[in-house]
């Protein structure tokens, strides 16, 4: 009846100190992650009511919601922590002592902020499992950390590092015109993948009064000129994102039909009529850099919402409140992307400030929802589930460190998340996810940015790669010398 799932621990499973992985470790891990772990775990394992020791090698998980068909898989993926290692330690404290683990690699040495070296565990207990055959082929893997992206690229070109996945379009287009690349000694490869690419966007904090009117949020999207940005800053490499589940069959498209339409019609009096009449499309331009028509539309929407321009300044109807907000960043590379957007906003009379802070301050502010707008995103998979509560549910809107960055509070969205979690078939999952996608898009909680359906990788010609690239893309875990 799906109210429980039982697992038997493999007899050969052991920690790196030689002690066996036990049922006690499993139970302790669940309770610790829910109580002291990242808030994500409280949502993810929220329907796991208990873990019970059945025998020395068997554990039973009981579920409070038997309609969540994914729960057995979710608990099957749970990180298992060594109880005996943590018994005399405070799990909530930061430490530089490498924790005990049980995987194919362990930490060999490290220097905080500079590098970490992993060494292969020769007697790794799972080495002969079918899932691991052909993987974990390197004796040592060193991961270097850099503060400056330019220095990383120079380190790669000089041979100090062996592999990099490039994340900047400008660098991919201009920074690797070298003899090593031309001669094929340094491989520069664009590998197609079929992973859902999720949503990267300018994210409104709707907890702020200034962003609580969806007409305002919709208006500001007309100031972002993706076509100009893609042409002039990204060398035409990106595709505009039109869904929170982009690059997958979960993305909403055209108008709702079939089961999706049936689901949405239940909420016909509670959701925008446009969902049934107009497919979502982000504003587009001619890429010439002066989106006059779009800014006119934005101005009209702002006027509908009670904002008008007086002396080149956008104010409310009483002329007492200025429209001003801050875009919070931590990446220097994003400033050149955000500044043209900010210039267009200023043409609407909006006083927008672009502020870049260090990563630690940025993380703390985001965790406490202390921002007006950020650039952020949500990953996606082919099987969305419990994690969607953390992204969009009303209960997550005020949960510190949750991923509901936009502050979404909508009872219909809450119900649609429950619908996709409880889906009994792929058809139901797709229909509920597409319906959720439409609600999120129609709410204008974000200004969608762009995505890439390939991996831009560079590596020195010393590696062997599988002849067939997995649909999910390549991974150095599958490579060899």
What residues fall within each predicted segment?
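A structural "hinge/loop" feature
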Residues: 1, 19, 41, 66, ...
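Aromatic- and charge-enriched surface segment that lines or borders ligand/interaction sites
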Residues: 1-39, 54, 60-62, 146, ...
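Short, well-ordered beta-strand elements
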Residues: 4-7, 26-30, 59-61, 103-106, ...
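Ligand-site clamp/hinge motif
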Residues: 6, 10, 93-96, 124-177, ...
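Surface-exposed binding/hinge segments that line
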Residues: 8, 14, 42-86, 104-111, ...
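Extracellular/periplasmic solute-recognition and catalytic clefts
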Residues: 50-53, 108-119, 144-208, 215, ...
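Gly/Pro-rich hinge or "lid" segments in bacterial periplasmic/extracellular proteins
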Residues: 75-135, 139-140, 147-151, 158, ...
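Detector for C-terminal structural segments
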Residues: 111-116, 223-282, 295-299, 332-343, ...
